[in-house]
Amino acid sequence: MEFDCEGLRRLLGKYKFRDLTVEELRNVNVFFPHFKYSMDTYVFKDSSQKDLLNFTGTIPVMYQGNTYNIPIRFWILDSHPFAPPICFLKPTANMGILVGKHVDAQGRIYLPYLQNWSHPKSVIVGLIKEMIAKFQEELPMYSLSSSDEARQVDLLAYIAKITEGVSDTNSKSWANHENKTVNKITVVGGGELGIACTLAISAKGIADRLVLLDLSEGTKGATMDLEIFNLPNVEISKDLSASAHSKVVIFTVNSLGSSQSYLDVVQSNVDMFRALVPALGHYSQHSVLLVASQPVEIMTYVTWKLSTFPANRVIGIGCNLDSQRLQYIITNVLKAQTSGKEVWVIGEQGEDKVLTWSGQEEVVSHTSQVQLSNRAMELLRVKGQRSWSVGLSVADMVDSIVNNKKKVHSVSALAKGYYDINSEVFLSLPCILGTNGVSEVIKTTLKEDTVTEKLQSSASSIHSLQQQLKL
């Protein structure tokens, strides 16, 4: 098929890097001339829509001595080639999807090549070659029996809409055996915080298997040292599928973009999470997602939206470290006649956090509460949040989750419906943590209207920024 270069340029009028995209697709046409190109509407996880270039066709896969033509569809984002394509199987009415390491129930394709996409070394031809190689190891489709073909209509309609709910229609599930008794934890990110979380979790002996996903290029020192000195039960990998069947997935990664504006910096984090969260959610569909990336309130919201997990299974580290420190200071430094467990730091991380008590007025009088709070907060302000401190706090939360301890932590949870907050924002609130994440939000006593106002102000500013992000 002759490649219509000028026609493609017209279709890509709104693409940021049109010439680079056209040149790459010209190269794709050399190897796969039968692909058909069109401009159609893609529906993202947040229900937003965008007209995107996509191409369809088949790729030849040799499996057990037979050649299969696997139908695929690639969606090219308007930021291509700096963002990877979104790839799907395109089954016909007599084909079913085999859910596996690289394919979910809706036919979306997940590959290491996509996860590690980096222009200019990553190209579509290279992606297709890896796709063929992976499908030769694990065929992604099977022929339906005549009785199943009628039910296939639902899946085809679903794929046509390009939405991403949870469905097992005409799909065969993969390897559930690891999900029975193993306490498997995954830490995403090989930076200082990722290393700190890995060491703290390892030291507490929480995990039977602990996976550290180091997504950086080359040897970055710390992860190399972990490989050299070989911690028991710790696996270091760059393949997201190594995280499969984790009970908790911890996000510590942050984009180090050179953007000038705060919005651009946050958006670069969002762009990175768009490539990570759906894949990690696919590999560990029953996990709790724990976010330590910054800004934690916004990135927890982003993770929730991209994962489509229920809100109770997506939490951020919030003010847990500050709360634990504050309780320790009140009990052990100020020697107050209270356990300290009635006081919490809640709200937004940083300068806008607030202090509250959990409704046990009879334990400490209001006057004493104010005096203790002021003195404790002064001591707390001199404490920094070093990576190792945050790592210890994360390990404590993970312990509560995997061992179902029903312990109260101040974590970033969906705050809608609390303190007259009506928007979908995450703020740190005292929550009981267990196997399924947040099982209950603890009510606190807010005697001062200024505290409620501060929480609502934080919610408003966070919501405003979220509205400007592109998910």
UniProtKB/Swiss-Prot annotation:
The keyword Cell wall biogenesis/degradation does not apply. NAD(+) binds at residues 191-219. One of its GO terms (molecular function) is ubiquitin binding. Residues 2-145 form the UEV domain. Colon, colon carcinoma cell lines, normal cervical epithelium, carcinomas of the uterine cervix and peripheral blood leukocytes. InterPro entries: L-lactate/malate_DH, Lactate/malate_DH_C, Lactate/malate_DH_N, Lactate_DH/Glyco_Ohase_4_C, NAD(P)-bd_dom_sf, UBQ-conjugating_enzyme/RWD, UEV_N. Keywords: NAD, Ubl conjugation pathway. CDD domains: LDH_1, UEV_TSG101-like. The keyword NAD applies. GO terms for cellular component: ESCRT I complex; extracellular exosome. One of its GO terms (biological process) is carboxylic acid metabolic process. In the N-terminal section; belongs to the ubiquitin-conjugating enzyme family. UEV subfamily. In the C-terminal section; belongs to the LDH/MDH superfamily. PANTHER family: L-2-HYDROXYCARBOXYLATE DEHYDROGENASE (NAD(P)(+)) (PTHR43128), UBIQUITIN-CONJUGATING ENZYME E2 VARIANT 3 (PTHR43128:SF33). Homodimer. Possible negative regulator of polyubiquitination. This is Ubiquitin-conjugating enzyme E2 variant 3. It comes from Homo sapiens. The gene is UEVLD.
